[in-house]
């Protein structure tokens, strides 16, 4: 018994239905609470939004927002990156979030200001910058 080959039109409809199912599942996911990670170095700022379990929902950095070279480390670049990462999450219905800030960069406060302005209620703001308890020897001092 030979299998019948489906027509081209039927194959196209099946493929479209499969793609529509994938897309719809992504957009209908409601996330009421999440965690916003801000990693601010002197050269760049990366903002990642995750759900409570740690799965990444959206992310952005100063580099992906179009800033290059030394401009990536500026507070304005951090503010733009934070707004860019939070916009799709607010559309998905996030109302409350916890903020975790890591690093010594200039973009720490600017990113936090942008998060506050987005309308998400912040349950807590935590500084998770790693500090050594006299661990590795630091590099030698720079002589210019």
Curated annotation (Swiss-Prot):
SUPFAM superfamilies found in the cross-reference section: Translational machinery components
Tree of life domain: Eukaryota
Keywords, ordered alphabetically: Chloroplast, Plastid, Ribonucleoprotein, Ribosomal protein, RNA-binding, rRNA-binding
Gene Ontology biological process terms from the UniProt entry: translation
MF-aspect GO terms: rRNA binding; structural constituent of ribosome
GO cellular component: chloroplast; ribonucleoprotein complex; ribosome
Compartments where found: Plastid, Chloroplast
One Pfam family cited in the UniProt record for this chain: Ribosomal_S11
Subunit structure: Part of the 30S ribosomal subunit.
Family: Belongs to the universal ribosomal protein uS11 family.
Name of protein: Small ribosomal subunit protein uS11c
Lineage: Eukaryota, Viridiplantae, Streptophyta, Embryophyta, Tracheophyta
